[in-house]
């Protein structure tokens, strides 16, 4: 009599599922049987969602409830148009924050309807270590400040094309009280090279720094842990 999935030990099935990297493949495997579905539900710790999330809030809620151990989440609306359905907004973002207690890494790209009020919900994530914002046109310096004050363990912050981020009070706060090791600021017109000095003593903790017009000879001084400094 041949073996069926139910005959295999759970440890073996977990190892098999972990080795499947493509999301589409994992989705297919989870449909094979209830046991693989449950293992995938328990083991999946990364989600990438975007324009196909419709209706956005309800769909994301369902995903978060199914995959309760999500640690890394990427939401991208690149290529979004008004006829693609509604984007995730502040209300939906609040639902996200209520259902992903283990979240440590978050990427928001082209999310036009999440503003400073929505970003403030992230302060409820004590484990959040990494935030990447790409083309976040509704988020300003105030939102970034509330984020860094609330997220005490933030060690990586990437800001790309965030045009409303201008004042750098948040950078001063990170320099004094933060644990920042990875800082990337690209194409944020409101932040100049001189503004980087606001990081102050925080420079000594940096291991990776990226700024689109940085002068290397200025910023490497005193950064004893800095290992990577790309520039353009």
Give the location of each predicted region.
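N-terminal adaptor-interaction module of cullin-RING ubiquitin ligase components
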Residues: 1-110, 115-123, 129, 135, ...
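Extracytoplasmic/lumenal domain signature
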Residues: 206-209
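Per-repeat beta-strand-to-loop junction in leucine-rich repeat
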Residues: 76, 109, 134-135, 158-161, ...
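Compact interaction modules built on cysteine/histidine frameworks
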Residues: 203
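Leucine-rich repeat
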Residues: 59, 82-83, 151, 160-170, ...
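ATP/adenylate-binding site constellation spanning eukaryotic-like Ser/Thr protein kinases
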Residues: 127, 231
């Amino acid at each position: 009599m041949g073996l069926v999935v139910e005959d295999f030990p759970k440890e073996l099935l977990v190892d098999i599922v972990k080795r499947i990297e493509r999301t589409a493949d994992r989705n297919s495997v989870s449909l094979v049987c209830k046991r693989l579905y449950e293992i995938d539900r328990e083991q999946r710790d990364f989600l990438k969602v975007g324009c196909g999330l419709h209706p956005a809030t309800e769909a994301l809620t369902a995903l978060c409830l199914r995959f309760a151990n999500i640690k890394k989440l990427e939401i991208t609306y690149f290529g979004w148009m008004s006829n693609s359905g509604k984007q995730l907004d502040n209300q939906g973002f609040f639902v996200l924050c209520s259902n992903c207690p283990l979240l440590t890494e978050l990427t928001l790209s082209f999310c036009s309807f999440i503003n400073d009020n929505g970003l403030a919900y992230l302060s409820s994530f004590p484990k959040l270590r990494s935030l990447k914002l790409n083309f976040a046109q509704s988020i300003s310096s105030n939102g970034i400040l509330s984020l860094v004050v609330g997220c005490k363990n933030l060690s990586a912050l990437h800001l790309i094309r965030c045009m409303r981020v201008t004042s750098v009070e948040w950078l001063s706060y990170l320099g004094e009280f933060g644990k920042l090791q990875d800082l990337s600021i690209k194409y944020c017109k409101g932040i100049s090279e001189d503004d980087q000095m606001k990081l102050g003593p925080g420079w000594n903790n940096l291991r990776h720094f990226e700024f689109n017009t940085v002068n290397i000879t200025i910023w490497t001084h005193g950064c004893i842990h800095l290992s990577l400094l790309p520039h353009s």
